[in-house]
């Protein structure tokens, strides 16, 4: 694209070379330049926590006790970062959307949700938001007239968005992806969506323009734990947790090296002769053969003295495992997890049922808070889809809606049957409805 500066971009699936194209305006080129620069800056921040969630991080070797030659050949990892994300993804599940005054899920919105297979896609958005601060939802026209709008979950690694001064509405957005190995770009503005692909000559050409003139960019940000100074959200993999994980991995590396060097007890031999270390042919035995076999019996010397064999204290792995357990306990406090979640099992004093329930309650409360934050983004997504169905206009009945979430806790059938039966008997719940069945 003429004038498009992409020299600093490093993306895993697509590069954007500065090649001529007569189909883009100067404004579009300037917009793409700004979005690409923003993507380059944000990508490093997003990956800094994502690599820990995937257990692909590189641990810095302090080079004090372990040389680089050993550290480069060994890799030690713990899966604690995933525990900061996965338990909440398991607790977040959308069952549908309700309009004011309705007790059952709205069927029009359910058709939109099911038609885009979002029951399966929603967990992708929750995982990205919890691990990388945010996820994106995009809305577009259907493949042909009369089709449902397309609703997609997009990784923040493949999106760049600029926002208004309040930080709640997108001004423009850029998305990149590959189809059959061919790079594609989607540029979203207030008036249109421009789809570009790289041709066989390496030049970018416009594949399609969807001129909707809706006055909004069909992109919604689902931010995790946003702040007034960080509307883009914060990862559940916090700097404190990352520090503990790095320290634990270094201790595991030390344990691995020490087990190789000191698992066989070291010995000291006094008074042995050279012949004790030779085979029947007079050749010197290897150190391993000598250590394993020859020290089982040593002959007296010519003066009748027996060589002395001393053994140093055997290596104790508890030197490292106790430290690792201490790090696991610290991580459990940050994660609101019971020790068993981090692999700590104490047979003599196991976690009590009350302690377990307290941790589960804390996680459930946190999941409910995330339902409120993520639910606001999901409502905006469904409202955008309704705009696409109604020529950019949002019907009055869809201006207010609520998300129906599956309860984060999973009580047994016996625990729920009694209170629901009493509510039905009191007339607080209808005997047959989606709400009653859900409970």
Task: Please tell me what each predicted stretch does.
Residues 109, 328, 382, 433-437:
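Generic structural marker for isolated residues within well-ordered, non-membrane alpha-helices
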Residues 1-153, 158:
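Extended, helix-rich architectural segments
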Residues 330, 334-399:
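C-terminal structural cap/anchor segments
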Residues 207-359, 406, 412-413:
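Extended, charged amphipathic alpha-helical segments
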């Amino acid at each position: 694209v003429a004038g498009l500066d992409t020299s600093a971009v490093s993306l895993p699936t697509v590069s954007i070379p500065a090649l001529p194209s007569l189909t883009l305006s100067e404004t579009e080129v300037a917009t793409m330049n700004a979005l690409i620069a923003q993507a380059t800056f944000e990508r490093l921040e997003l990956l800094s926590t994502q690599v820990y969630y995937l257990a692909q991080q590189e641990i810095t070797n302090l080079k004090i006790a372990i040389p680089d030659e050993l550290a480069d050949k060994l890799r030690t990892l713990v899966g604690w970062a995933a525990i900061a994300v996965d338990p909440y993804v398991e607790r977040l599940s959308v069952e549908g959307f309700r309009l004011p005054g309705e007790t059952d899920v709205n069927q029009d919105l359910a058709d939109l949700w099911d038609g885009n297979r979002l029951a399966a896609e929603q967990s992708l958005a929750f995982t990205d938001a919890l691990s990388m601060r945010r996820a994106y939802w995009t809305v577009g026209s259907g493949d042909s007239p009369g089709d449902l709008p397309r609703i997609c979950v997009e990784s923040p690694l493949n999106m760049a968005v600029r926002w208004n001064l309040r930080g709640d509405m997108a001004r423009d957005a850029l998305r990149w992806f590959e189809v059959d190995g061919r790079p594609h770009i989607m540029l979203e503005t207030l008036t249109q969506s421009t789809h570009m692909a790289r041709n066989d000559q390496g030049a970018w050409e416009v594949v399609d323009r969807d001129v909707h003139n809706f006055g909004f960019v069909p992109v919604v940000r689902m931010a995790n734990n946003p702040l007034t100074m960080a509307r883009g959200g914060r990862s559940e993999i916090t700097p404190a947790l990352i520090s503990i994980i790095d320290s634990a991995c270094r201790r595991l590396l030390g344990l691995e090296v020490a087990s190789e060097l000191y698992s066989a007890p070291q010995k000291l031999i006094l008074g042995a002769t050279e012949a004790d270390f030779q085979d029947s042919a007079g050749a010197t035995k290897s150190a391993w053969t000598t250590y394993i076999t020859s020290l089982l019996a040593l002959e007296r010397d010519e003066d009748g003295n027996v060589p002395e064999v001393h053994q140093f204290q055997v290596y104790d792995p508890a030197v490292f495992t106790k430290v690792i357990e201490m790090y696991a306990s610290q991580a459990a406090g940050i994660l609101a997890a019971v020790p068993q979640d981090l692999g700590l099992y104490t047979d003599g004093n196991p976690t009590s049922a009350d302690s377990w329930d307290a941790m589960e309650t804390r996680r459930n409360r946190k999941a409910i808070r995330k339902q409120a934050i993520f639910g606001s983004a999901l409502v905006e997504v469904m409202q955008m889809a309704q705009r696409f169905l109604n020529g950019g206009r949002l019907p009055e009945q869809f201006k207010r809606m609520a998300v129906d979430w599956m309860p984060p806790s999973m009580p047994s059938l016996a625990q729920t049957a009694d209170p629901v039966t009493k509510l039905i008997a009191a007339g607080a719940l209808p005997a047959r409805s989606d709400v009653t069945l859900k409970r």
